[in-house]
From Swiss-Prot:
Top enzyme category: translocase
Name of the protein this chain belongs to: NADH-ubiquinone oxidoreductase chain 4L
Species, as recorded: Trichophyton rubrum
Lineage per the UniProt record: Eukaryota, Fungi, Dikarya, Ascomycota, Pezizomycotina
Superkingdom of the organism of origin: Eukaryota
Record InterPro entries: NADH_UbQ_OxRdtase_chain4L/K (IPR001133), NUOK/Mnh_C1-like (IPR039428)
This protein's encoding gene: ND4L
Entry coiled-coil feature ranges: none
Family label: Belongs to the complex I subunit 4L family.
Biological processes annotated in GO: ATP synthesis coupled electron transport
Role, per record: Core subunit of the mitochondrial membrane respiratory chain NADH dehydrogenase (Complex I) that is believed to belong to the minimal assembly required for catalysis. Complex I functions in the transfer of electrons from NADH to the respiratory chain. The immediate electron acceptor for the enzyme is believed to be ubiquinone.
Keywords noted in UniProt: Electron transport, Membrane, Mitochondrion, NAD, Respiratory chain, Translocase, Transmembrane, Transmembrane helix, Transport, Ubiquinone
GO MF term set: NADH dehydrogenase (ubiquinone) activity
Length: 89
């Protein structure tokens, strides 16, 4: 459980500290999601419950779809603006 908490905090810190780079923000969101999935798997193994493992597979599938959609939006953003940097005004 400590590893999951450490990964979650790394993801939160990466998201907060890299506010200008969209790719690093997407990677940080994926780290957060996978740390929660890891926690669900650990809990599922501790309680000997197959439902948690099924739910973890579902989360990994959704995370893959989210990554594909996010990268598609990123490509469209790059084509529109010519840069992937986020500008705050």
């Amino acid at each position: 459980m400590n590893l999951s908490l450490i990964l979650f905090l790394i993801g939160i810190l990466g998201f907060v500290l890299n506010r200008k780079n969209i790719i690093l923000m997407l990677i940080s969101i994926e780290i957060i999601l996978l740390s929660v999935t890891f926690l669900i798997l650990i809990s599922s193994l501790n309680f000997d419950d197959i439902l948690g493992q099924t739910f973890a597979i579902y989360i990994i599938t959704i995370a893959g779809a989210e990554s594909a959609i996010g990268l598609g939006i990123l490509v469209a953003f790059y084509r529109l603006r010519g840069s992937i940097a986020i500008e705050y005004k």
